[in-house]
Amino acid sequence: MVHSHTVRLPLAALALALVLPACAGVGTEPLPGRPAHHAEGGFRNTNPEFKRPDGWTRFTFFVRRGWATLTAPRTYEAPRRDNDGSALRAPDPGAPTITWVGHATLLVQLAGVNLLTDPHWGERASPLSWAGPRRLSPPGLAFERLPPIHLVLISHDHFDHLDLDTVKRLAAAHDPLFLVPLGLKQWFADNGMTRVEELDWWQGAEHRGLRLVCVPAQHFAQRSLWDANRRLWASWALIAPERRFYFGGDSGYFSGFREAGERLGPFDLAAIAIGAYLPQEIMRFTHTTPEQAVQAFEDLRARQLLGIHWGTFDLGDEPLDEPPRRMRAEAQRRGIPPDRAWIFDLGETRRW
């Protein structure tokens, strides 16, 4: 008799090979007369050095990671702080705060506006309920403890950054405006959400006294076999009279950080991914190492660095507690004081 798990394991390994957000972007040719990152049927990275890992390298990585996730998942409990959300539900409008919920999910409170980045309260970064990277630690803030959410920024469509159940819960409970890169508005509409504004790189929108600018990132997009790079990926800049905030989402290191710093900086705070960087033959063009994150922080001309995208989902080969140690070491090597290179506990809130 064939047990169900003997079928599920190879199927899950295949599914994970498709959905784990750790492969390289799909290269396509630019369209004449269009922005350089626009391509036939979708979008492309413009860095001439960008190189996609070969098919065998990707295949072996995905199968190995998928099998390990199912048969020998790693465990890690990130440091956390109790946060019942009471202070967040009665904020001081003159004291901007930021709270790390986990991975790339941040609650930003500025000028009376409550904004979330890449909200994810799900148990897995996967389309499957029984397979895929499982959350290692509970969210730092319970969904029910959120203050009223006015705006939501989405960087791209990968399952660790765009969780369908979470955004549907947000739409039902808070009715926020979602700001998304090109191509994602239709995905939201297909899932019953219409308060969505989509932007191309360097386009901006004004909402509730804030200017939000969609800025380039070096990454890729994909949620299935059939939609590789049909939707754009991006970072975001939030500009208010008293503060400037940069949210990196997912990106490999490239000249776009310096360009964003020159065009929109200096920033008061830059939240940049520091995890999912090994193996380098897979990750090097689409995820920053902790050292590259510190360089990006300097390129952005930011006052504060916040390392995110670590310790929540097991997406790379590096030790799960390594990214913060490497980021702090690199900041120290460059003479950046510890109070400018932030690593948060889950649920931690700081003024910025």
PLM region spans:
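Cap/insert and terminal regions of metallo-dependent hydrolase folds
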Residues: 24-50, 142, 151, 158, ...
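Metallo-beta-lactamase
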Residues: 11, 18-145, 181-249, 268-275, 326-348, ...
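Acidic/histidine-rich helix-loop elements
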Residues: 121-138, 220-227, 278-287, 314
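Divalent metal-coordination and catalytic microenvironments
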Residues: 108, 118, 156, 163, ...
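Active-site metal-binding motif and surrounding structural segment of the metallo-beta-lactamase
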Residues: 51, 58, 130-179, 195, ...
